[in-house]
């Protein structure tokens, strides 16, 4: 089961997406569908078929967002988190080979588009490093075996609590 946590920034992005889809994109596509339908035969009408499919995708996403947003818990930065890895942290880690990675621990629904530097709180990597401090070592179980990592730095977006 996915964790129903989200950062303030993630919530705002999803709310903004909902508002854009509902107030701008859906009315625009509805007009196109209405126009294409008025042309007559819909069986070979590419404009109608394509935009009707797009309208269904928009409606599906809007339904999901309307159900998801009220159920989610927004997690803002708290000074008690400082110095340890918790939800919303930007963490830089390094392994013994010197490979360095930096990412943010977020809710599963925040990982979309080109958010390659986000990992889910539900991931084995995030779970393994929770509550760890800088210079601590942690182990992640992978199909190839256990992997050792060291925490180089931990940062939080402190302004998110003020937004």
Curated annotation (Swiss-Prot):
<dbReference type="InterPro" id="IPR001437">
    <property type="entry name" value="Tscrpt_elong_fac_GreA/B_C"/>
</dbReference>
<dbReference type="InterPro" id="IPR018151">
    <property type="entry name" value="TF_GreA/GreB_CS"/>
</dbReference>
<dbReference type="InterPro" id="IPR023459">
    <property type="entry name" value="Tscrpt_elong_fac_GreA/B_fam"/>
</dbReference>
<dbReference type="InterPro" id="IPR028624">
    <property type="entry name" value="Tscrpt_elong_fac_GreA/B"/>
</dbReference>
<dbReference type="GO" id="GO:0006354">
    <property type="term" value="P:DNA-templated transcription elongation"/>
</dbReference>
<keyword id="KW-0238">DNA-binding</keyword>
<dbReference type="GO" id="GO:0003677">
    <property type="term" value="F:DNA binding"/>
</dbReference>
<protein>
    <recommendedName>
        <fullName>Transcription elongation factor GreB</fullName>
    </recommendedName>
</protein>
<dbReference type="InterPro" id="IPR022691">
    <property type="entry name" value="Tscrpt_elong_fac_GreA/B_N"/>
</dbReference>
<dbReference type="InterPro" id="IPR036953">
    <property type="entry name" value="GreA/GreB_C_sf"/>
</dbReference>
<dbReference type="GO" id="GO:0032784">
    <property type="term" value="P:regulation of DNA-templated transcription elongation"/>
</dbReference>
<dbReference type="Pfam" id="PF03449">
    <property type="entry name" value="GreA_GreB_N"/>
</dbReference>
<dbReference type="InterPro" id="IPR006358">
    <property type="entry name" value="Tscrpt_elong_fac_GreB"/>
</dbReference>
<dbReference type="InterPro" id="IPR036805">
    <property type="entry name" value="Tscrpt_elong_fac_GreA/B_N_sf"/>
</dbReference>
<dbReference type="GO" id="GO:0070063">
    <property type="term" value="F:RNA polymerase binding"/>
</dbReference>
<dbReference type="Pfam" id="PF01272">
    <property type="entry name" value="GreA_GreB"/>
</dbReference>
<keyword id="KW-0805">Transcription regulation</keyword>
<comment type="similarity">
    <text>Belongs to the GreA/GreB family. GreB subfamily.</text>
</comment>
<keyword id="KW-0804">Transcription</keyword>
<comment type="function">
    <text>Necessary for efficient RNA polymerase transcription elongation past template-encoded arresting sites. The arresting sites in DNA have the property of trapping a certain fraction of elongating RNA polymerases that pass through, resulting in locked ternary complexes. Cleavage of the nascent transcript by cleavage factors such as GreA or GreB allows the resumption of elongation from the new 3'terminus. GreB releases sequences of up to 9 nucleotides in length.</text>
</comment>
């Amino acid at each position: 089961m996915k964790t129903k946590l989200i950062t303030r920034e993630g919530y705002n992005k999803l709310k903004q997406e909902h508002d854009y889809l509902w107030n701008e994109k859906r009315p625009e596509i509805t007009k196109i569908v209405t126009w294409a339908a008025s042309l007559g035969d819909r069986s070979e009408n590419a404009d109608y078929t394509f935009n009707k499919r797009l309208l269904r995708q928009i409606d599906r996403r809007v339904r999901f967002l309307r159900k998801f947003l009220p159920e989610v818990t927004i997690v803002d930065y708290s000074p008690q988190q400082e110095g340890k890895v918790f939800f919303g942290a930007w963490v830089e880690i390094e392994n013994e080979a010197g490979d360095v990675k930096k990412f943010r621990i977020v809710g599963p629904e925040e990982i979309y588009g080109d958010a390659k530097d986000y990992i889910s709180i539900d991931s084995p990597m995030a779970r393994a490093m929770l509550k760890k401090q800088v210079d601590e070592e942690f182990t992640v179980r992978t199909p190839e075996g256990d992997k050792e990592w060291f925490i180089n730095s931990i940062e939080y977006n402190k302004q998110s609590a003020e937004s």
